[in-house]
Amino acid sequence: MDKYDDLGLEASKFIEDLNMYEASKDGLFRVDKGAGNNPEFEETRRVFATKMAKIHLQQQQQQQLLQEEALPRAGRSPVNGGNRQGASGKLAADGAAKPPLAVPTVAPGLATTTAAAQPSYPSQEQRIRPSAHGARPGSQNCGSREGPVSSQRPALHGLSPSCEDPSCLTHGDYYDNFSLASPQWGDKPEGCPSVSLGVGSGWPGCPGNDSTLPKSCGDHHPYQPQLSTVCSGRSFESGISGQDGGIGGHSSEKPTGLWSTASSQRVNLGFSSMGLENGTSAQPKGTTVSAPMVPSSASQGACPKRDSGLGYEASGRVFKPLVDTQPWLQDGPKSYLSVSAPLSSTAGKDSTQPGMTTGLDPKFGCVESGTSPKPSPTSNVHPVMSTPSELSCKESSPSWSTDSSLEPVLPGSPTPSRVRLPCQTLAPGPELGPSTAELKLEALTQRLEREMDAHPKADYFGSCVKCSKGVFGAGQACQAMGDLYHDACFTCAACSRKLRGKAFYFVNGKVFCEEDFLYSGFQQSADRCFLCGHLIMDMILQALGKSYHPGCFRCVICNECLDGVPFTVDSENKIYCVRDYHKVLAPKCAACGLPILPPEGSDETIRVVSMDRDYHVECYHCEDCGLELNDEDGHRCYPLEDHLFCHSCHVKRLEKGPSPAPLHQHHF
């Protein structure tokens, strides 16, 4: 426990360096960009990994010394064939609590399992050796003896071959290899050679567990130099070949144990995982192959396999709880699951090995051929937390593998086949369609986009006074009476014809075309002519704030129509043309008595006003000398007795005699 406390202290120091991680709102973790390049953090992680590797190596060396001392005692004292569950469980717990050791030598006829990181593998003759003695009849009591076999190997063998130094591992990979070190338990009778698949733990099976066929218990086989106990004869032995990271060192599994009787196989559910190892026999009975499977906490599943040519039968149970293996290894024996497994009597006949399921989904237990399974009446399950996953069932193939380089081949099978390791699949949830609000919003957005594309903002004139919508483009705009309309909105209120470019009448807030206005009964609201007093039903002429018929608007002198012609009126509102106005109303010259008219080509008249009299410009001069009079010096007018004189002439008139009338001097 002191060693584990030291590891806990080292781990707590390492966790303190992780305070740079920042918790995000979505529940995940994100790291600061600068923290990933922190040399202090990288140095701490490297030092921590190096220390952990050294501590782990020291533990392995100490356990190797203890193992070497225990091996001779285990070889000299084989266990007799008594059904002692407590003692065997204790041995299994002691063996599993220690990290595994690699065994350099293997007895003939025994199963051999090598870690995935080791470069060398046993040959086909060592891995698959049919018994030369053949099948021997044995007693039923021999199979009921429990034989837990434990083998240990260094956990460093589970590392990748390209990275033997634990300090080069990442944080997650190092803990996977350290905490999930898997011991190898394996021992075979001479007549029951087995094949190690190199992926996960192996279950070497012997066809001697058929309770209906007698087996021989008289033969003993050489013991493997490990902590092992094997019953004499053809007992159904238990063996576990653990490999951590069978493929690249990433897959780690913990030791498991199989307790079998002559008519049943009992599986301890407290184990964390069970791998796969195929056991073959020279008898034509068949071969029991354990297949990987992960049941739920209260369920188990099995899938028997059958080879049509050789009569091989495969079944498997794999349990992967999410708990550590050390507490239950120290608590003593657990309850087990007993499942009967009858074998076929001939090689050509279909044989099945049942898979017992308790509250399991049908996909976790399937039988491909043969009879229905018969579970044993004694079935005890030790509850553990586990994660269910699917079991892949493949037909006509007793070979199970995940890597072509580590794929073993059973005797007699033409080609090896692959099987997918159990994995937990996440089913995608149902896709939810858009809601009603989202559909409406999308429709409005598309409509707005279409309007903006069809009508650029540069052609926007304003809002129509009739429909209150925007007016885009000069071709749709129509302006009348100071208001803006759409071309389609400015129509006659009676016939709905467009009035753009046509005469229209605006009556009582409504717009009418000329025809509808004349013949639709709106005459009572029409204007009357100022001259004749009749209603204006046709064209109207407005002048001086009054309405006229165009034919009524004429000059009172010449009677010519003044529509579109300049005109003027007098004080009595009589209409004159400009020419007649000047003739009739033009002022008359006080000298000659003629009217003062504007010159030709002009509407303006030029006149001289003196003594409240009007004169032509040429008529305004001295009556005696004829000097043109004006405002200049020497040309000023000096009237005398209503006559126009210059200054000299005026003096002369005064010297001759006084005039009875007063003289008035005007200056212009």
Swiss-Prot record:
PROSITE patterns noted in UniProt: LIM_DOMAIN_1, LIM_DOMAIN_2
GO terms (BP aspect): cell migration; cytoskeleton organization; miRNA-mediated gene silencing by inhibition of translation; miRNA-mediated post-transcriptional gene silencing; negative regulation of canonical Wnt signaling pathway; negative regulation of DNA-templated transcription; negative regulation of hippo signaling; negative regulation of osteoblast differentiation
Localization (cell): Cytoplasm; Nucleus; Cytoplasm, P-body; Cell junction, Adherens junction
Gene giving rise to this polypeptide: Limd1
Family note: Belongs to the zyxin/ajuba family.
Tissue-specificity statement: Ubiquitous.
Region of interest (Interaction with EGLN1/PHD2), ranges: 181-256
UniProt keyword Transcription, yes or no: yes
Oligomeric form and interacting partners: Interacts with SQSTM1 and RB1. Interacts with EIF4E, AGO1, AGO2, DCP2, DDX6, LATS1, LATS2, EGLN1/PHD2, EGLN2/PHD1 and EGLN3/PHD3. Interacts (via LIM zinc-binding 2) with VHL. Found in a complex composed of LIMD1, VHL, EGLN1/PHD2, ELOB and CUL2. Interacts (via LIM domains) with SNAI1 (via SNAG domain), SNAI2/SLUG (via SNAG domain) and SCRT1 (via SNAG domain). Found in a complex with TRAF6, PRKCZ and SQSTM1. Interacts (via LIM domains) with TRAF6.
Interaction with RB1 as annotated region, ranges: 396-434
Mediates nuclear export, as annotated region: 54-128
Gene Ontology terms for molecular function: metal ion binding; transcription corepressor activity
Induction: Up-regulated during osteoclast differentiation.
Disordered, as annotated region: 74-160, 239-258, 277-309, 340-414
Superkingdom of source: Eukaryota
Domain LIM zinc-binding: 462-523, 527-587, 587-656
Any single Pfam family the record assigns to this protein: LIM
Organism (species): Mus musculus (Mouse)
Post-translational modification: Phosphorylated during mitosis.
One Gene Ontology cellular component annotation held by this UniProt entry: focal adhesion
Modified residues (Phosphoserine): S139, S228, S235, S273, S296, S308, S413
Record field: compositional bias (Polar residues): 111-125, 138-153, 278-300, 340-356, 369-405
Alphabetically ordered keywords of this record: Cell junction, Cytoplasm, LIM domain, Metal-binding, Nucleus, Phosphoprotein, Repeat, Repressor, RNA-mediated gene silencing, Transcription, Transcription regulation, Tumor suppressor, Zinc
Coarse class of the protein's main subcellular location: cytoplasm
Location of the region described as Necessary for nuclear localization in the Swiss-Prot/TrEMBL record: 464-668
Known function: Adapter or scaffold protein which participates in the assembly of numerous protein complexes and is involved in several cellular processes such as cell fate determination, cytoskeletal organization, repression of gene transcription, cell-cell adhesion, cell differentiation, proliferation and migration. Positively regulates microRNA (miRNA)-mediated gene silencing and is essential for P-body formation and integrity. Acts as a hypoxic regulator by bridging an association between the prolyl hydroxylases and VHL enabling efficient degradation of HIF1A.
Protein's UniProt name: LIM domain-containing protein 1
